[in-house]
């Protein structure tokens, strides 16, 4: 993929984020469920590719890569509502009777730098 295509993809992702479609927790849960379902549906093909490319056994491919990703997705599915929930914090006496909280919300697009072949 050349730099102009990368730039185009990044711009499309930024525009999509600006629509606010990704803000609801429900959207994030559905995206994680789709990712998990696709990984599970293609588990044998992913394991075969890891075996062919890296020489890992299918067991090692599952334990160290596929299973690891599935476990992380499952963890996020279980806890994403808690992570996105507003957190009550103490309010200075000078602001009585106000209530203070920290609102968790996505910042936007991120760049993830990781090895090209791990996990799969």
Regions found by a protein language model. Give the residues of each.
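Conserved small-residue-rich beta-alpha loop and adjacent elements
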Residues: 91-120
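N-terminal Rossmann-like NAD(P)+-binding subdomain of aldehyde/semialdehyde dehydrogenases
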Residues: 1-101
């Amino acid at each position: 993929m050349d730099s102009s295509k990368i730039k185009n993809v990044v711009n499309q992702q930024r525009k999509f984020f600006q629509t606010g479609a990704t803000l609801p927790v429900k959207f994030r849960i559905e995206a994680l469920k789709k990712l998990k379902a696709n990984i599970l549906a293609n588990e044998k093909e992913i394991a075969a590719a890891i075996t062919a490319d890296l020489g890992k056994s299918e067991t090692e491919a599952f334990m160290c890569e596929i299973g690891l990703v599935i476990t992380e997705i499952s963890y996020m599915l279980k806890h994403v509502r808690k992570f996105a929930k507003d957190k009550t914090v103490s309010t200075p006496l000078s602001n009585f009777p106000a209530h203070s909280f920290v609102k968790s919300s996505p910042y936007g697009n991120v760049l993830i730098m990781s090895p090209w072949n791990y996990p799969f």
